Amino acid sequence: MSGFIDEVPIQIRAGHGGAGSVHFHKEKFVEFGGPDGGDGGKGGDVIFLAEGRMMTLENYLPDRMYAAQDGEPGLGQNRNGKNGEDLILKVPVGTQIIDSVTMELIYDFNHDGESFTIATGGRGGKGNTFFKTSVQQAPRYSQPGEEGGAFSLILELKLLADIGIVGLPNAGKSTLLAKITHAHPKIAGYAFTTLSPNLGVVHRHEDLFRYTVADIPGIIEGASRGVGLGISFLKHIERVQGILFLFDGGNLQLEEELEMLRSELGNYNQTLLDKKFLLVINKMDIWDNDPSFTEEIQKKYSHLGEIICISADKEFNLEYLLERIDKVFFTEKVKLVYENT
């Protein structure tokens, strides 16, 4: 996911309404034609549209003004000016629009195709025809167009994932994501390979049920203070239903690592600690996927939560992991799938 941008300040302005026309009817042999100035066109609106295929805000330049088209001025012969074209700004699903002055949330996009008109174009001004009365037969004035709405905004993207994979660098998060979703994150044998979130879709039960999984960049101790890559990427799992804590089975310090990870999550947002979770120990192929060793680990650390041992690279025990994800996080949804088939 190159060029991943999840926050950008922008300016937006709806179109100015066109001015009304001051014009009089002109016709051969008619000395005093009456007013026939048309109205100005309405300014274009600024509309945000959620696009399911977008994954980043990289198309937006910081502090740039994004303006809809102004309405055109009115014309003679009672012809109204053309309305300005609306400006459609596409954003990823999960984008929040925030007022940069008050920092209030204006809108939160949760569905593909969802739209929101953030600023309405100004009304066009009335032409002098509108002002003709029995007393004032030839008004020589018209109305200016109104200004369109304008805002200073912050666009903030929070990916809409159902499950978040959290762990230390090099725990195998990207490999696990690739194996269970067929996503294509960058994978290598060194820390901080993942520099931005990756998202994939798991297809279950003959594709009758799907859910999204986010692979979050590695977290290290002190991340909440900006160490390593920091924890700003945790915004992308604020809305998940569950968390997979992933550990390196070749260098296992489960209790200490879990305590550190949960501490960093809590420092970012305490509500993350209330989410359901599974403890997943990866790279068990180092131990030849030994059942007795797996049993020993599960017994030793059972007080911490449910433990599942896998090898993402060798695809060992992945189906069981997916079954447990179904059961722990999506029981009701899976039940509905079978009730409706």
UniProtKB/Swiss-Prot annotation:
Binding site for Mg(2+): 174, 194
Disulphide-bridged cysteine pairs: none
Domain OBG-type G span(s) in chain numbering: 161-330
Residues bound to GTP: 167-174, 192-196, 215-218, 282-285, 311-313
Positions of the Obg domain: 2-160
Enzyme Commission number(s) of this protein: 3.6.5.-
InterPro entries listed in its UniProt record: G_OBG, GTP-bd, GTP-bd_Obg/CgtA, GTP1-OBG_CS, GTP1_OBG_dom, GTP1_OBG_dom_sf, OBG_GTPase, P-loop_NTPase
EC class of the enzyme, as a word: hydrolase
GO CC annotation: cytoplasm
Cellular compartments annotated: Cytoplasm
Source organism superkingdom: Bacteria
Entry-linked CDD domains: Obg (cd01898)
Keyword vocabulary terms for this entry: Cytoplasm, GTP-binding, Hydrolase, Magnesium, Metal-binding, Nucleotide-binding
One term of GO molecular function: GTPase activity
Keyword match Transferase: no
SUPFAM superfamilies: Obg GTP-binding protein N-terminal domain, P-loop containing nucleoside triphosphate hydrolases
Family in the record: Belongs to the TRAFAC class OBG-HflX-like GTPase superfamily. OBG GTPase family.
Subunit structure: Monomer.
NCBIfam families reported in the protein's UniProt record: Obg_CgtA, PRK12299.1
Alphabetical list of PANTHER family matching this protein: DEVELOPMENTALLY REGULATED GTP-BINDING PROTEIN-RELATED (PTHR11702), MITOCHONDRIAL RIBOSOME-ASSOCIATED GTPASE 2 (PTHR11702:SF31)
Stated name of the protein: GTPase Obg
